[in-house]
């Protein structure tokens, strides 16, 4: 979901930000991967609207299938964003654009779709993570890339159910005290209160750990001289979609709903 300007950081030993830009190339495969994730998201939201807003029965779309599809989409976007945080320039500008877009979505849903209000959605998360990764990188770069990926994978799995009050792995963990789940401020970090509702909710924890996993994947590619593998293959339709992710993301729901409304009105 992050755009980057096509300029890549040279492959230094540690893959540090700020290394001299030595060539102007684009990792086309990243665009294609974002395009694939976006198409899956459009498919999921179309299916969700058909079932939940237009009342069409779909017994085959089980909760397990829905969960796996949701996880694939969000993990793809967030990890790709963490990876791309090390490509290009102006991370704070990128963060402000994403947070600004999230404010627009909040305002639109508040006015036109209050029953599907979006508070602290994925764009807010990506904006916050994009702003935090630069200061955090000073600490993260000291960690071996493979070890860092493993550590933050475990941290994500251990905090995956923190929104529901549980911390730990299945069969090994504990429930957090209720006083942590106090208000919207705590909800931002991952501790939503009882009356908190959002149609798209991605709190800082646990999802920042997935973003950092993407950062370490970049490190692994950079330190092993593997970034060149992302220049091919060229799949131009997917690349185009991947480069327009933010605007497509912001427009896809009203377009889907409008198209479905016309279809069900006619048929």
Which residue ranges define each predicted feature?
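Alpha-helical transmembrane segments and their immediate juxtamembrane cytosolic regions
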Residues: 2-267
């Amino acid at each position: 979901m992050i755009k980057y300007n096509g300029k890549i950081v040279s492959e230094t030993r540690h893959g540090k930000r700020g290394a001299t830009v030595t060539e102007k190339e684009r990792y086309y495969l990243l665009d294609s991967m974002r395009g694939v994730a976006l198409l899956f998201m459009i498919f999921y939201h179309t299916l969700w609207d058909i079932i939940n807003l237009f009342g069409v029965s779909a017994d085959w779309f089980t909760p397990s299938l829905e969960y796996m599809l949701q996880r694939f989409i969000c993990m793809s976007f967030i990890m790709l964003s963490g990876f791309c945080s090390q490509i290009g320039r102006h991370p704070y500008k990128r963060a402000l654009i994403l947070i600004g877009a999230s404010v627009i979505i909040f305002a639109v849903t508040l006015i036109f779709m209050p029953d599907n209000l979006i508070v602290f959605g994925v764009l807010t998360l990506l904006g916050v993570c994009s702003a935090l990764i630069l200061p955090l990188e000073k600490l993260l770069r000291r960690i071996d890339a493979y070890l860092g990926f493993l550590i933050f994978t475990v941290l994500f799995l251990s905090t995956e159910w923190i929104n529901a009050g549980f911390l730990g792995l299945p069969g090994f963990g504990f429930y957090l005290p209720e006083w942590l789940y106090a208000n919207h401020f705590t909800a931002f970090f991952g501790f939503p209160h009882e009356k908190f509702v959002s149609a798209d909710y991605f709190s800082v924890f646990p999802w920042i750990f997935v973003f950092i996993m993407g950062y370490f994947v970049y490190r692994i590619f950079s330190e092993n001289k593997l970034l060149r593998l992302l220049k091919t293959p060229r799949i131009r339709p997917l690349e185009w979609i991947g480069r327009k992710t933010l605007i497509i993301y912001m427009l896809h729901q009203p377009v889907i709903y409008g198209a479905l409304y016309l279809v069900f009105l006619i048929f």
